[in-house]
UniProtKB/Swiss-Prot annotation:
GO terms for cellular component: cytoplasm; small ribosomal subunit. It comes from Ruthia magnifica subsp. Calyptogena magnifica. This is Small ribosomal subunit protein uS19. The gene is rpsS. Protein S19 forms a complex with S13 that binds strongly to the 16S ribosomal RNA. PROSITE patterns: RIBOSOMAL_S19. InterPro entries: Ribosomal_uS19 (IPR002222), Ribosomal_uS19_bac-type (IPR005732), Ribosomal_uS19_CS (IPR020934), Ribosomal_uS19_SF (IPR023575). Pfam families: Ribosomal_S19 (PF00203).
Length: 89
């Protein structure tokens, strides 16, 4: 079920504060966050946000195509090693 339009997009308060400070200072170093549930908003365009994937922080450069998606979509959590029987010639 989609989120109600009257509520607006969800973004953690601590993350939006860091984004606004980075924009004010024109700071380009990555913003570390564990908030995979936060939605990408237009204020984040051009910033690099390091999203935690359970092990490390994955740097994600935000562009206009990412608006409306959640940060967790861009930091893969599972590593695929391949199927064991794929060695057929």
């Amino acid at each position: 079920m989609a989120r109600s339009l009257r509520k607006g997009p969800f973004i953690d308060e601590h993350l939006i504060k860091k984004v606004l400070v980075a924009q004010e200072k024109n700071d380009r170093k990555p913003i570390k966050t564990w908030s995979r549930r936060s939605v990408v908003v237009p204020e984040m365009i051009g910033l690099t946000i390091a999203v935690h994937n359970g092990r490390v922080h994955v740097p994600v450069s935000i562009n206009e195509n990412m608006i409306g998606h959640k940060l967790g979509e861009f930091a893969i959590t599972r590593t695929f090693k391949g199927h064991s029987g794929d060695r057929k010639v």
